[in-house]
């Protein structure tokens, strides 16, 4: 457990992709810090499990691949009615899969890009509206070190994460007039269900993956940076990407 604690009592946050991995960790820590949390994901079963962990967690089932503007609006309207305007949001939803240049499944490639990039933009377009967000709200998106180093076989995943990282700078300028902030985080390999599922699907064992200087990351190694960016201590930080990789990028050229 971390010795550094944040107090988000009386604040409201939305976490998209909250049923597993980084999203679940972030939603849980926000609730532990006193915030009301709207946890959004596809799996109703996992969301029900989350809801039982804290009375501060409210849930909504939503598929970011098919969600319309009306769907996002309905979810946020309910949360705002219950607890007031939001103070920020985190978009962690993402999928990966092998998409090499020499041959890839077009449907998979489209789903990868739409989940990471299109979904995050759709969420922000709705969540950053005056009727849903307080002045000075903070938003965090997820990029990846794959967007920096270029990873063989991850053409669309790396491209989608690059798009997220670039979009953050533009969006920061568009929402800054209300004091809103937006930043992204680029983790390396983190021990999550999605990472392990991907490695298994391509026949890679855990030991065959290059880790950072500080070893393989855990969700709680990344969530601390998220909470910092959501907090008032980061009030002068926007439009940036934070590589949170345990030193992975330091060893890129070894």
Task: Indicate residue ranges for each PLM-predicted region.
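Residue(s) in the substrate-gating loop at a strand-loop-helix junction
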Residues: 144
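A conserved structural motif in NAD(P)-dependent oxidoreductases
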Residues: 211-222
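Active-site helix of classical SDR
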Residues: 124, 160
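Short C-terminal tail/terminal secondary-structure segment
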Residues: 2-3, 227, 238-254
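Alpha-helical segment proximal to the catalytic Tyr-Lys
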Residues: 129, 173-174
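Catalytic Tyr-X3-Lys loop
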Residues: 95, 102-122, 140, 164
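Short, small/polar-rich loop/turn modules that mediate ligand/substrate recognition or access, typified
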Residues: 176, 181, 237-239
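Conserved glycine-rich cofactor-binding loop
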Residues: 19-20
């Amino acid at each position: 457990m971390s010795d550094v604690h944040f107090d988000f009592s009386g604040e409201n946050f939305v976490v998209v992709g909250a049923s597993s991995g980084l999203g679940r960790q972030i939603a849980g820590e926000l609730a532990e810090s006193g915030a009301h949390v709207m946890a959004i994901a596809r799996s109703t079963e996992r969301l029900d499990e989350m809801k039982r962990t804290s009375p501060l967690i409210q849930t909504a089932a939503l598929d970011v691949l098919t969600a319309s503007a009306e769907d996002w609006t309905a979810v946020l309207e309910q949360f705002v009615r219950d607890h007031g305007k939001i103070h920020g949001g985190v978009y962690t939803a993402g999928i990966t899969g092998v998409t090499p240049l020499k041959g890839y499944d077009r449907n998979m490639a489209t789903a990868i890009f739409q989940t990471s990039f299109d979904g995050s933009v759709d969420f922000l377009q709705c969540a950053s509206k005056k009727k849903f967000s307080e002045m000075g709200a903070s938003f965090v998106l997820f990029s990846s070190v794959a967007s920096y180093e270029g990873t063989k076989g991850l053409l669309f995943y790396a491209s989608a994460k690059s798009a997220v990282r670039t979009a953050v700078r533009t969006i920061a300028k568009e929402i800054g007039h209300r004091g809103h902030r937006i930043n992204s985080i680029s983790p390396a390999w983190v021990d999550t269900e999605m990472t392990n599922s991907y490695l298994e699907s391509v026949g890679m064992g855990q030991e065959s993956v290059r880790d950072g200087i500080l070893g393989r990351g855990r969700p709680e190694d990344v969530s601390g940076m998220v909470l910092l960016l959501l907090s008032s201590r980061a009030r002068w930080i926007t439009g940036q990407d934070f590589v949170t990789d345990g030193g992975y990028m330091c060893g890129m050229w070894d």
